């Protein structure tokens, strides 16, 4: 079963129940989609004995995806500032959320660049795949969230139309 999840601006998104523990996320590294070389990458070309003070820890240098680790909740924050909403696809396939973004070659300050990435996240047990939502902030942060199936059942249903 495959469910497409629309990517919408965050101001258009409905308010959802707050996710407990959202301030203590897990981290995924290597989220720099073609942004050039870091000091640590350049420093590997010269011996560390010559200039050890030029090195910076990779965990400080790299932007991260944030994945809170609370059981029963699902939330991911991805930096996708180099992609437009039309270039980003979010869909639910089985018990996974798949994110794909791609743009064709375009000019930048260093010449030309094309970017593409795929990310796949497993939904925790008890999360309703149909409840997955995504929103894109003006700063280029993609937020993907889902609530537990039990939380969906406890929400009041909208009044019936007459």
Curated annotation (Swiss-Prot):
Modified residues (Phosphoserine): 16, 157
PROSITE patterns referenced in this protein's UniProt entry, alphabetically: SHSP
Chain positions found as Deamidated glutamine: 66
InterPro entries named among the record's database cross-references: A-crystallin/Hsp20_dom, Alpha-crystallin/sHSP_animal, Alpha-crystallin_N, HSP20-like_chaperone
Localization: Cytoplasm; Nucleus; Secreted
Domain of life of the source: Eukaryota
Covalent link location (Isoglutamyl lysine isopeptide (Gln-Lys) (interchain with K-162)): 31
GO molecular function terms listed in the Swiss-Prot or TrEMBL record: protein folding chaperone; protein homodimerization activity; protein kinase binding; protein-folding chaperone binding; structural constituent of eye lens; unfolded protein binding
Cystines in this chain: none
Reported modifications of this chain: The N-terminus is blocked.
One Gene Ontology cellular component: cytoplasm
Annotated stretches, region: Involved in stabilization of the HSPB1:HSBP6 heterodimer: 1-72
Domain sHSP: 56-162
Cited Pfam families: Crystallin, HSP20
Major localization listed first in the record, in broad terms: cytoplasm
Crosslink (Isoglutamyl lysine isopeptide (Lys-Gln) (interchain with Q-31)) position: 162
Keywords of this entry: Chaperone, Cytoplasm, Isopeptide bond, Nucleus, Phosphoprotein, Secreted, Stress response
Coiled coil regions in record: none
Subunit note: Homodimer. Small heat shock proteins form high molecular mass oligomers containing variable number of monomers; these oligomers display a very flexible quaternary structure easily exchanging their subunits. Heterooligomer with HSPB1; formed through oligomerization of HSPB1:HSBP6 dimers; subunit exchange leads to formation of at least two different heterooligomeric complexes, differing in variable quantities of HSPB1 and HSPB6 homodimers in addition to HSPB1:HSPB6 heterodimers.
Function: Small heat shock protein which functions as a molecular chaperone probably maintaining denatured proteins in a folding-competent state. Seems to have versatile functions in various biological processes. Plays a role in regulating muscle function such as smooth muscle vasorelaxation and cardiac myocyte contractility. May regulate myocardial angiogenesis implicating KDR. Overexpression mediates cardioprotection and angiogenesis after induced damage. Stabilizes monomeric YWHAZ thereby supporting YWHAZ chaperone-like activity.
Family assignment from sequence similarity: Belongs to the small heat shock protein (HSP20) family.
Protein name per UniProt: Heat shock protein beta-6
